[in-house]
Amino acid sequence: MELDSGKPLSLLTLDEIDQHEGGIIQSFRTGHTTPYPDPADWLNSEEPPPGVFVTSVEKVLNWSRHYSLWPVMFGLACCAIEMMCMAASRWDLARFGMDIFRASPRQADLMIVAGTLTWKMAPWLKRIYDQMPEPKWVLAMGACGTSGGLFRDSYSVVPGFNMVVPVDVYVPGCPPRPEALLRAIMDIHEKIDKTRIIKR
């Protein structure tokens, strides 16, 4: 290391080193004459200064979950066709942060269940739900998913997904349009924003 004079640092006297460091400190002091705003000045005011964002950890976590839902698809019947249609370019599911439907429930936090659920398939729905990490949400799509639909009185059909797993949002219709499913996803987003993570 050398000084501006070109003299190696090892050949400098202590006075020369002190003068050099003093010059660095003085130039630093002259460049930093304006203090940063005292938090006491703006914390109690209406608006924080530009560039300062005040929030809670809970809101940041909910915000990140809101925009990065990873869905797993459990399509059983005709409603699944509308779900696939919703993922196409016309409705652009990517703007909600849901670009890719997950292949494994262990990577998903939203399960979209669409179609007619039979009692024979119900244990598999429960197993997939149990494999999802917390926090997790379930969206029941279609008349069959919400109440059993046309097949409600059949001996083999479950009269609604809520008989097997807890459901957060119901989407009525036979089959529901992609717009209705997008509205349900926005309802899930509202639920996520209100989720309490930290226990008091």
UniProtKB/Swiss-Prot annotation:
<dbReference type="GO" id="GO:0009060">
    <property type="term" value="P:aerobic respiration"/>
</dbReference>
<dbReference type="GO" id="GO:0008137">
    <property type="term" value="F:NADH dehydrogenase (ubiquinone) activity"/>
</dbReference>
<dbReference type="InterPro" id="IPR006138">
    <property type="entry name" value="NADH_UQ_OxRdtase_20Kd_su"/>
</dbReference>
<keyword id="KW-0874">Quinone</keyword>
<dbReference type="GO" id="GO:0045271">
    <property type="term" value="C:respiratory chain complex I"/>
</dbReference>
<feature type="binding site">
    <location>
        <position position="174"/>
    </location>
    <ligand>
        <name>[4Fe-4S] cluster</name>
    </ligand>
</feature>
<comment type="subunit">
    <text>NDH-1 is composed of 14 different subunits. Subunits NuoB, C, D, E, F, and G constitute the peripheral sector of the complex.</text>
</comment>
<keyword id="KW-0813">Transport</keyword>
<feature type="binding site">
    <location>
        <position position="144"/>
    </location>
    <ligand>
        <name>[4Fe-4S] cluster</name>
    </ligand>
</feature>
<dbReference type="GO" id="GO:0005506">
    <property type="term" value="F:iron ion binding"/>
</dbReference>
<dbReference type="GO" id="GO:0005886">
    <property type="term" value="C:plasma membrane"/>
</dbReference>
<dbReference type="GO" id="GO:0015990">
    <property type="term" value="P:electron transport coupled proton transport"/>
</dbReference>
<comment type="function">
    <text>NDH-1 shuttles electrons from NADH, via FMN and iron-sulfur (Fe-S) centers, to quinones in the respiratory chain. The immediate electron acceptor for the enzyme in this species is believed to be ubiquinone. Couples the redox reaction to proton translocation (for every two electrons transferred, four hydrogen ions are translocated across the cytoplasmic membrane), and thus conserves the redox energy in a proton gradient.</text>
</comment>
<keyword id="KW-1278">Translocase</keyword>
<feature type="binding site">
    <location>
        <position position="79"/>
    </location>
    <ligand>
        <name>[4Fe-4S] cluster</name>
    </ligand>
</feature>
<keyword id="KW-0830">Ubiquinone</keyword>
<keyword id="KW-0479">Metal-binding</keyword>
<comment type="similarity">
    <text>Belongs to the complex I 20 kDa subunit family.</text>
</comment>
<keyword id="KW-0408">Iron</keyword>
<keyword id="KW-0004">4Fe-4S</keyword>
<dbReference type="GO" id="GO:0048038">
    <property type="term" value="F:quinone binding"/>
</dbReference>
<keyword id="KW-0520">NAD</keyword>
<keyword id="KW-0472">Membrane</keyword>
<protein>
    <recommendedName>
        <fullName>NADH-quinone oxidoreductase subunit B</fullName>
        <ecNumber>7.1.1.-</ecNumber>
    </recommendedName>
</protein>
<dbReference type="GO" id="GO:0050136">
    <property type="term" value="F:NADH:ubiquinone reductase (non-electrogenic) activity"/>
</dbReference>
<keyword id="KW-1003">Cell membrane</keyword>
<dbReference type="Pfam" id="PF01058">
    <property type="entry name" value="Oxidored_q6"/>
</dbReference>
<keyword id="KW-0411">Iron-sulfur</keyword>
<dbReference type="GO" id="GO:0051539">
    <property type="term" value="F:4 iron, 4 sulfur cluster binding"/>
</dbReference>
<feature type="binding site">
    <location>
        <position position="78"/>
    </location>
    <ligand>
        <name>[4Fe-4S] cluster</name>
    </ligand>
</feature>
<dbReference type="InterPro" id="IPR006137">
    <property type="entry name" value="NADH_UbQ_OxRdtase-like_20kDa"/>
</dbReference>
